[in-house]
């Protein structure tokens, strides 16, 4: 591309997309932030909602594509916004960004407070929704459900996780220091992290020195239950188990065989941390059980496993799975298999049916010419694979003694796939105690060892242990209870938050609290935010900051 065409392209590019910092002199001369175009349907959805500035920031942010790992345009919008307010920003090599706002009023000489949220969002859509998350804006809608007022999206994730936290931080940065009657604010260090949703990668690579972070109190705005304060979270890590297999074309001899699919579907699935204590069914494990039962019912040499697959995300309980088996082409063999699957389905309904009302386990004949050319696993390989799946820990392993009802340690058997020479199983383990997490991962290693396989484990990210002497907890609890008129909930969450990693990066002496407005259905097209909780949430943030502004 010629220099002229590059310049022409740059001239046509909106300011919020330009990479690199615009000079302070340009803004001093009267330059104005050029925000992204907010779709008319989104404007209609947020009309009249308070606080208006926060909703405007959220709508603008939602008009900029920001999938995990591709947050550049949103980050550039934040930079341009900061410069339009004559605020300084710094970034590190990972793309994390910090914007600095001086304190106002009596808070001018107070210690800085870090306001933190992540910029990226989960990108999920309904199968009948035409939406490109790399280019299209989120289209919002306003509706009433269960007598509550909600803002959601039209067939996609909304991005309130964590767009609400980012919008709140931008609203704080944008408060006019000369506003009459405004609450005093301490110096604010607004930290915007990247690539949170795919494994906390931005927080893991955060460079506190490059970002100029000095605050020793942090408000994480990435929780979704208004009225509760969160003081701890689980750490976690993935284990990729690989089990060698052998395929044998002659396992069924010279007999004619047909193909059958054993399929499990209709399960609820859900988050592998937040929902793990509910006892939801795991599609992979139910499929392993049903397949094992089917092979045993057929009898030696009369059925063999060809393939198995299920699950697609490390942090989701598998909703469905299927196995393909080769079966001798006799009516008696097929009937024995179908009867065994009916019995397995009945047993599963007895175990899970009150919760998993959509659960289905079925066996049906299929015709797939490609699969006829796939040699089945030999009997030993199939037995080792299915036995290993059923031996792996799944669900809550231990509950907390300190916070009754809170899962302390868990494991999720997240996915399985069978290739030519090996089967791969992904597990996601969590614990708020580091040693318990590693003990769980060691159990996974032991199962893999007994199956003749190996394990590659990701570096575990740390949990966040509750601090009973937390000053920010005392202040937040008092102020929240004054606002609510009743006792505030103090909780920990069995899921990964950036807080654990950020404490490691910013120093163990940092004091942290996490909270947010009410958001339901996060990570799905059902995601929605209770609009009536947004104003009190933002006012509460200001209450905390006003209190800290007086702490010299």
Role assignments for model-derived ranges:
Residues 184-283, 287, 291, 295-296:
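Fold-level recognition of mixed alpha/beta catalytic cores in primary-metabolism enzymes, strongest
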Residues 210-211, 279-300, 329-334, 380-390, ...:
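His/Asp/Glu-rich mid-to-C-terminal helical/loop segments that flank catalytic regions of hydrolases
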Residues 1-34:
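N-terminal mitochondrial targeting presequence
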Residues 59-63, 311-314, 324, 360-376, ...:
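A short beta-alpha structural unit
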Residues 32-150:
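Acidic/His- and Gly-rich active-site-bordering loop/insert found
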Residues 46-54, 401, 408-423, 428, ...:
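Zn-dependent metallopeptidase/amidohydrolase metal-coordination segment
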Residues 107-209, 214-216, 238, 379-382, ...:
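Active-site metal-coordination/substrate-binding segment of hydrolases
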